[in-house]
Amino acid sequence: MGLKHLIEKLEPHFTHGGKLEKYYPLYEAAATIFYTPGQVTRGAAHVRDAIDLKRMMILVWFAVFPAMFWGMYNVGLQTIPALHKLYGTEQLQQVIANNWHYSVAQWLGVSFSADAGWLSMMTLGAVFFLPIYITVFIVGGFWEVLFAIVRKHEINEGFFVTSILFALIVPPTLPLWQAALGISFGVVIAKEIFGGTGRNFLNPALAGRAFLFFAYPAQISGDLVWTAADGFSGATPLSQWASGGGEALVNVATGIPVSWMDAFLGNIPGSIGEVSTLMILIGGAIILFGRVASWRIVAGVMIGMIATATLFNVIGSDTNPMFSMPWYWHLVLGGFAFGMMFMATDPVSASFTDKGKWSYGVLIGVMCVLIRVVNPAYPEGMMLAILFANLFAPLFDYLVVQANIKRRKSRG
């Protein structure tokens, strides 16, 4: 019996009048993973395309894999030296025994020696990242399925993207219950309340992170959360620049100064998926060439960031080191690159019109640098900049449409 035949045999049980009718969204979600729905348009004019919402979301999901895998490796790369800086051999064994992450990693064969290999670092990072991602995926999927069953519509695959994006923009040390709470806020409050996929005006992943930032700031900001070593305190390079300028950039665990190339490659502490600009750009290129993301938004963000950073460089300041940060450092520090490629380009919460996309992107770039520089107490400005621009996206589209209407009327 072929798979397609099995799916067709099960279909009557889930369609109207079947015993499992109320669970049709679950059947439809599973069936369309393997086969395109057999729906046709009712009108004569229609457009045929090989890509649909499911495949678009899966493309974005795969596009973040380079940043995800590097992020897992980097968690181990930052954690093991930090543990050796804090503890001797006997103390380290006791710490490993008292921490379930370390215990699981050791059971999987991870070496905690100072010369541990890349596989040990990758595995250790996976032990921190995968529980967060699995928690977020299950909880986010639960809300998606629940709302689909209650509203009697198909399950949208948006939670595939929302879940992995959310898991990649939080620290590796985030408690699992807070991860569940954050994704619940993002999916329910920022998306489903407004009608679900395609109707939300805020990015759900960023809304969930913003909720955690204001509700539980100690677990998602500060110096204690970015390196997954018990008792270790180390600021991110962005925070270091905010307090002491470019000369203050140093890897706290190793004492080695942080170069621009270190930041570009991702050899720095930070949120799991935001550290490697190189991997982010590789994934971003995939969704740009796949036409899932708009190059106009990306270009607008870069233009706004470069112009604003250059302006602050020219103005200068004797008291605020952030005025001196060049645009190419803004690009590789914090969540700028990840936000630009994967958050700002969200086709639902961004502007729809071509001219609106330019304005939307420029606003994000300007606001990110403005928040970073003018408010050094909160050096990471990309999250708030994108959420702020989400609110203005409908206005940009409205102004573009009204301008087109006036122009056409003036033609006679």
UniProtKB/Swiss-Prot annotation:
It is found in: Cell inner membrane. The keyword Metal-binding does not apply. Pfam families: NQR2_RnfD_RnfE. Keywords: Cell inner membrane, Cell membrane, Flavoprotein, FMN, Ion transport, Membrane, NAD, Phosphoprotein, Sodium, Sodium transport, Translocase, Transmembrane, Transmembrane helix, Transport, Ubiquinone. One of its GO terms (cellular component) is plasma membrane. It is an enzyme of class 7 (translocase). GO terms for biological process: respiratory electron transport chain; sodium ion transport; transmembrane transport. It comes from the Bacteria. The keyword Cell inner membrane applies. Its cofactor is FMN. The modification FMN phosphoryl threonine is found at residue 236. The chain crosses the membrane at residues 57-77, 127-147, 163-183, 270-290, 297-317, 322-342, 358-378, 381-401. It is a multi-pass membrane protein. Belongs to the NqrB/RnfD family. NQR complex catalyzes the reduction of ubiquinone-1 to ubiquinol by two successive reactions, coupled with the transport of Na(+) ions from the cytoplasm to the periplasm. NqrA to NqrE are probably involved in the second step, the conversion of ubisemiquinone to ubiquinol. This is Na(+)-translocating NADH-quinone reductase subunit B.
